[in-house]
């Protein structure tokens, strides 16, 4: 593995959800060219950690999360994307995709370059990119104009994972990467994760599937009670 891309330093984050889990003095690092897995029964702080890493839950201590050496804990999701972070949340609809928008428009969540300086959106570019994800990840959809909510859970999962991977991330964080997909698609997603690693990307995978984590992880951590 190469240089540290993600560093989590003594992260403490009280949970705003009464049914959630506080994060307490959590330390973690992910280096370029490695896959780090996080195992554990759901409800032990994995979701809260994902919110903290994605920028949905800003942290009080700016240095508690560093991306490529830059303090990132106070940055929002878009600013973190500019540092090379791409993210697949556990919740597909609502967080990973906007249900009522087309797949092409959902590409905008990670393809800000399609918005021109004039403010116009390059729809041809978005449609080409969406079609590329559909083809590469064998997403069953009528085309780039299909709405996100029209896809089955497994096909939407493939689209979201593919959209984030095709952005060529420096840091790729994914929660439950193969939930709801068939055996063939799960094998492809795992293979694509390993290909990202081999290309020098730092990868963090949260999964309840131990066999999956054993297959793809270079290092493995277990979360318990935050």
Protein language model features and the residues they cover:
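Glycine-rich phosphate-binding loops of nucleotide-dependent enzymes
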Residues: 1-226
